[in-house]
Design a protein with these regions (language model features):
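A cross-family signal for key residues in well-ordered alpha-helices
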Residues: 15, 63-67
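Hydrophobic positions on the alpha-helical face of helix-turn-helix-like DNA-binding modules
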Residues: 65, 78-79
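Basic/polar phosphate-binding segments, predominantly the helix-turn-helix DNA-binding elements
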Residues: 16-18, 24-60, 79-104
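An amphipathic alpha-helical interaction segment
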Residues: 1-15, 38-40
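Alpha-helix N-cap/loop-to-helix boundary motif
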Residues: 2-5, 22-26
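Flexible coil/turn residues that form the inter-helical turn or adjacent wing/linker of helix-turn-helix
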Residues: 23, 71-73
Length: 105
């Protein structure tokens, strides 16, 4: 994930997302907050970062969860702390991202 951007608006959005990773954030809410159309937000974000907003949030959440697990937290605690809707969706996303299970971290 490219987190460097010369676009001030994208830098502000990245900062907001990083501070609110555990909250549910819709594209429409994000667009309203930063006074952009939904299309312009999604297009500009992908152009500047190389990934979609959804994949950015998921990747950051999973990295945070992996750090928690490595620091001794349980898998279920990491799942809850990172804002995943269910344990099974967390495990599925974790396997896809890291090619291993959280217990093998």
């Amino acid at each position: 994930i490219n987190t460097f951007s010369s676009n001030k608006k994208i830098v502000e959005i990245l900062d907001f997302l990083n501070k609110n990773l555990t909250n549910r954030i819709s594209i429409d809410e994000l667009a309203d907050k930063f006074y952009m159309s939904r299309y312009h937000l999604m297009h500009t974000f992908k152009e500047e970062t190389g990934c979609t907003i959804g994949s950015y949030i998921t990747t950051k959440r999973l990295l945070f969860a992996r750090d928690m697990i490595r620091d001794g937290s349980s898998v279920s605690a990491a799942c809850d702390a990172c804002g995943f809707g269910s344990y099974s969706s967390f495990i599925r996303a974790y396997r896809k991202q890291f090619h291993s299970t959280p217990t093998n971290t």
